UniProtKB/Swiss-Prot annotation:
Subunit structure and binding partners: Monomer.
GO CC entries: periplasmic space
GO MF annotation list: metal ion binding
InterPro entries for this protein: AdhesinB, Bact_metal-bind_prot9, Lipoprotein_PsaA-like, ZnuA-like
Signal sequence annotation: 1-21
Primary localization: periplasm
Organism: Chlamydia muridarum (strain MoPn / Nigg)
GO biological process, any: metal ion transport
Localization annotation: Periplasm
Record has Isomerase as a keyword: no
Family: Belongs to the bacterial solute-binding protein 9 family.
UniProt protein name: Metal-binding protein YtgA
Superkingdom of origin organism: Bacteria
Length: 326
């Protein structure tokens, strides 16, 4: 009786077996497709300022990953679940260096790691820029000076061409394109920020992230030579926005604002705004001062690194009374 039922429904059974076979084939094909994607070389960039440049150089030839993204403060970032795996699968790890990635968990995985490309250290070794420091600590914010970051992109391209030679010609061509755009942006920034009246070229921000920017774009040749360019910028917090701000810090900035007749202070996108609001409210009677209409981006990006640089230049130029040139 059982075999009679089997014969009766054998066409149904055959159909089910055929369908199952299709699923198996489909699954295998899908697996092969995913495997192909996963087999691409993985490149890990520690932040978006690096990632956006590496991605432009490599295109889709590699799998690009960014570790610290969004509004997260890179100064205080501690590794989370999955970060160790991202580092393990990556052939190259680009970091900014100069003390930016200074948390204990990051140092543990970066220091002594043969896959790590420390951009700051490499540029210093090649005398690509003059290092700034505060209280004995190096200033890591080199990406705010497009002229310095051009050297970093050259270093990224050099490493990528050497490590992934099968795409060397393509990477070099992409790098030349991006470097040309960056040189145009640098010249544009110099010309636009030069339209700011000299008496207005004072930059007050949330933390000390714009020293390289100030030295490059808001100072005269004489000020850069003498070191007096440092008088062009001020902030209540140091290089890393982690420490508590004291009343003394606030009053120091207030005195600076009054001494230089500063009319506007700039918030930063990821920082607590209370300190600068207190500074504005503490300003002496008769000192007209306000918060800028738009925040600056220091340790993160708005859309991408290149648009962020343009945003900062436009915002500072317009707020300080200059004219943004096209």
């Amino acid at each position: 009786m059982f075999f009679l039922h089997v014969r009766k429904y054998k066409h149904v059974i055959g159909g089910l077996l055929c369908l199952a076979g299709c699923f198996v084939i489909s699954s295998c094909s899908s697996g092969r497709g995913n495997k192909s994607i996963d087999e691409r070389i993985h490149i890990l960039s520690m932040n978006r300022m690096i990632y956006d440049c590496v991605s432009r150089i490599t295109g889709d030839r590699v799998k690009n990953i960014v570790l610290i993204d969004g509004s997260i403060d890179p100064h205080s970032y501690e590794m989370v679940k999955g970060d160790e795996d991202r580092m393990a699968i990556s052939q190259l790890i680009f970091c900014n260096g100069l003390g930016l990635e200074h948390s204990a968990s990051l140092r543990k995985h970066l220091e002594g790691n043969s896959k790590v490309i420390d951009l700051g250290a490499r540029l210093l070794d090649k005398n690509c820029f003059v290092l700034l420091s505060e209280d004995g600590f190096p200033d890591p914010h080199i990406w705010t000076d497009m002229g310095v970051w051009i050297s970093x992109v050259k270093e990224m391209a050099s490493v990528l061409v050497q490590q992934i030679p099968q795409y060397a010609e393509e990477f070099q061509k992409n790098a030349e394109q991006i470097l040309s755009e960056m040189e145009d942006l640098d010249r544009w920034a110099v010309r636009s920020l030069a339209t700011i009246p000299e008496k207005n070229r004072y930059l007050v921000t949330g933390h000390n992230a714009f020293s390289y920017f100030t030295r490059r774009y808001l100072s005269s040749d004489e000020e850069r030579e003498s070191g007096n360019w440092k008088l062009r910028c001020m902030s209540p917090e140091g290089l890393s926005p982690e420490a508590q701000i004291s009343i003394r810090d606030i009053m120091r900035v207030v005195e600076y604002i009054c001494a230089n007749d500063v009319g506007v202070v700039f918030l930063e996108d990821t920082l607590n705004q209370d300190a600068l609001r207190k500074i504005v409210s503490c300003s002496k009677s008769g000192q007209k001062i306000r918060l800028a209409k738009s925040p600056l981006y220091s340790d993160n990006v708005c859309d991408n690194y290149f648009n962020t640089f343009q945003h900062n230049v436009r915002t500072i130029t317009e707020e300080l009374g200059g004219t943004v040139l096209e």
